[in-house]
Amino acid sequence: MYPDDSLTLHTDLYQINMMQVYFEQGIHNKKAVFEAYFRQQPFKNGYAVFAGLERIVNYLKNLHFSESDIAYLESLGYEGAFLDYLKNFKMELTVRSAKEGDLVFANEPIVQVEGPLAQCQLVETALLNIVNFQTLIATKAARIKAVIEDEPLMEFGTRRAHEMDAAIWGTRAAVIGGASGTSNVRAGKLFDIPVLGTHAHALVQVYGDDYKAFKAYAETHRNCVFLVDTYDTLRIGVPAAIQVAREMGDRINFLGVRIDSGDIAYISKKVRQQLDEAGFTEAKIYASNDLDENTILNLKMQKAKIDVWGVGTKLITAYDQPALGAVYKIVAIEDDNGQMRNTIKLSNNAEKVSTPGKTQVWRITSREKGKSEGDYITYDGVDVNELTEIKMFHPTYTYIKKTVRDFDAIPLLVDIFKDGEQVYELPALMDIQAYARKEFDKLWDEYKRVLNPQHYPVDLAKDVWQDKMDLIDQMRQKALGGEEE
């Protein structure tokens, strides 16, 4: 490894190639605006939970080309004035973003980058890499939390995560989505997350006996959660846990037992009965074993007696949808006269047509009910709070419309960097979690459903929509050589 290694080259080669084109053509400092967004709700959910901003900030603050970066690029064939430009690179971007914990929706900008064209191009890959992963994990955690409600969710996925960075930042994202704590000690240290550890089957196997293993553990640790399913949960494991808890008395804090296999719905009811009959009515039952929101929902339908949920593989890997699919598109570019020109990306797939222009997303909230009525996308500089009513309509199915009055409009995109200088103070992680929960409570129940949620409105202001339609027509006419279809 290089002692001066940086994350600046955490990018795709074609970003560097395009930077070189812009530089050689003398347009690298033209002002540009790019916006990141995703096209479909993850997990067929009604919302997504935005995460990743802290790492984006850390990445951008340290954006520079080190000596070893320059040497490596030179080995790839880059040379001359372009390398000199990279040596003197100074981050000058203006960045606006949703806040971590914000609920975000398909086809609205969640990160907006403005500044020199070449710099905007460089950061695409890293920004998407961060947002695509962390938003996915935060959303998965929020789905699980929506099912278990006030019961604790513990993140147990480190060993199944896609490498160490994914484990650390995935844990943090899971906490934003609602996890109460983690088994990951390093994540606990870095982000001040509560940590919880029980023990593995190996401890019982080493002693060859549940009672001896639990007794040894209790003599070492005051807070005890015993894993009771190594050999036989109901006939060996739970009785041994009860015996040790009785013998140790006040010398330990008997928190409960963990079940990691078998018919959890049936076994948990029997374990609850055994603990209650032994007088340990306050002892909790912890469950793990490839759980996710769907399994937990099923267990709850069977009235399983679980108090704490340990979720690992299917949370930290976003098991049922491994990619969010966020994209990063240019929406405006400075022309030769110094004026900003809106740009659009067309496609035969309607969902892949981008929205042109630098925009702002407004969360429209009913003053009477305190609930979110939808998101309204305007051009930047418009203050929706100056309006007395908003006519919202679906950007594709325009006959779906409604008029909203007596509302508050809250801008989603806030200033993070201005001309390369950080202007946003990063909040503490648990404050972000509390904020996410507050935002979740503003959603109507129809949008919160884990299964078949209602579609949350994300609508364009009429002028934005009309300009989009006009640009589509212009580009189609250009493709046809000016002929009418």
What kind of feature is each model-predicted range?
Residues 1-30, 44-45, 291-485:
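Gly/Ser/Thr/Ala-enriched C-terminal appendages of enzymes
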Residues 1-31, 40-42, 77, 83-92, ...:
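Buried, small/hydrophobic-residue-enriched core segments of structured protein domains
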Residues 30-88:
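N-terminal, Lys/Arg-enriched amphipathic/low-complexity engagement segments
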Residues 33-35, 92, 153, 327, ...:
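A residue-level signal for beta-strand positions that form part of recognition/binding surfaces
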Residues 52-53, 136, 428-432:
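Short amphipathic alpha-helical segments
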Residues 71-72, 139-143, 157, 448-455:
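Short coil/turn segments at secondary-structure boundaries
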Residues 75-83, 163, 389-397:
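Short, positively charged
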